[in-house]
C-alpha cells in the first residue's frame, strides 16, 4: 500500500510557521488536543513542535522564562529531525520511520520538497485493524510445523468446509523453533466444524 492512501492532506492539518511565537503553538496544541504540530511555511516542511518540547526547553534551556511564550519563536524549539517520505513510498517504510524516530507523524513531501501532508501512527494502526479483519469473523490460531505446504493445506481445509478466509497472518515467534503460529480470521456458518476438521488434519489449536 502506498503512503498516499493513508496520509492526511495538508488541507485538513493545522500548522504553525517557524516565526510564530511559542504561545500560538501551545494554544493550538492544547485546543486541538494534539501531540505535536507540523511546522510549515510556504509549502516547505521544517519540523514539528510539541508540548513536551516546549516545556522541556522552558525548564532546561530558556534564559528568560518571563517572556518565553511571547518572545520566543517556534524555530528555537522545534524538532527538525522529523523524517520525510514520498506519497508513492510503501507504508511499511513509513511505519519503520515512525518506530525508529519515535515521532507522532512523518511528513509527506513531493520530489520538489513541497509539503503534502502527514502520516500518523493512528492511520497505520487503523488500516492494520481493517486489513486483519479484527472486527470481522472469528479468530482461529493454529500451531503448525514450519514445513512447506502447511499454509496451503490449512487454507484448503477451511475453504472446503465452508469457511471464508478474511485474513491470514503467520507470526514469527522470534526464537529458533520448528513451529509457527498461523492466525486466521474466518467467516463461517459453522466455525466449530472447521475447527474440528483442522484438528483432525494434525494441526494444534492454540
Model-found features: residue ranges?
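A short, glycine/Asx- and small/polar-enriched loop/turn
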Residues: 176-182
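Tandem CBS (Bateman) regulatory domains
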Residues: 1-12, 50-86, 90-100, 111, ...
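OB-fold/S1-family RNA-binding modules
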Residues: 29
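Cytosolic beta-strand hydrophobic patch enriched in CBS
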Residues: 16-18, 35-49, 85-86, 104-119
